[in-house]
C-alpha cells in the first residue's frame, strides 16, 4: 500500500511548470507520482517526456486524449490542434512507443483511501467531459461499471481542480500543471491519507520567456502567454465544456 501519492495532470509539454512541481518537497518525498494524461502535447514535448522517464519507477503513467492524438498524428491522422501536430513531429520513436502503450486507467491502493482509480477524463473514455457541477444521473452513468470497492476516482482533462462526492464516491480533479484555467500556477494533488489540492507558484514571466526561447514551436511565445498566464477563466472553460457534459 502506498502512503503518499502526488498526482500531476495535463502537463501539456510545459517544462518550467513541471520542474517547479517536481521540486516541491511533498512531491519529492511521495512514494509515487501518477500522471493522469495529456503529458506532452505542448511546446516542450521531448524535454518533458525525458525528464519524467528519467524518474523511472517513481512515475506511473495514464493515457490522456492528447497523448493518443500525438500517436495518431504521427501515423497520418492530424489533430485539429496545431501544437499537437507539431509536437508529434518532434517526438522520438521510443517516446511515441511509450505513449502508444499507456493504459486508460490504473488502480492503486493508497493509505486512508483504499483502491483509487486514476484516469484522464472518465474511467471509460479519455475525452469524455465531467465537471464539478455535472448532474448526479450522469455521474451514475459514467461510473456504472466501476467495482464497488473503488470509492475514490481521480481524473483530469478539464484543467480545473475540484473535489466532490458522487453517491459516496470521492471524485478528485487535480487541475492542470501546464494549462491551468482560472488562475496561474501549476495545480496538482497529494493523496494519502486524505486529499489535498495544491498549487505551485513559479515565476511566470521567466517561464514564458524560457518557453519562447527554448521551443521551436512557431507560436511558442503565444502559447506560453495564453496558458501559463491563464488567460482563460474557469467560467470561460465551463461555458465551453458544458455542451459536452450533455447540457
Describe the function of each predicted region.
Residues 25-29, 55, 110-112, 146-149, ...:
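Glycine-rich phosphate-binding loop signature in dinucleotide/nucleotide-binding domains
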Residues 165-247:
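Acidic, His/Gly-rich catalytic cores of divalent-metal-dependent hydrolytic chemistry
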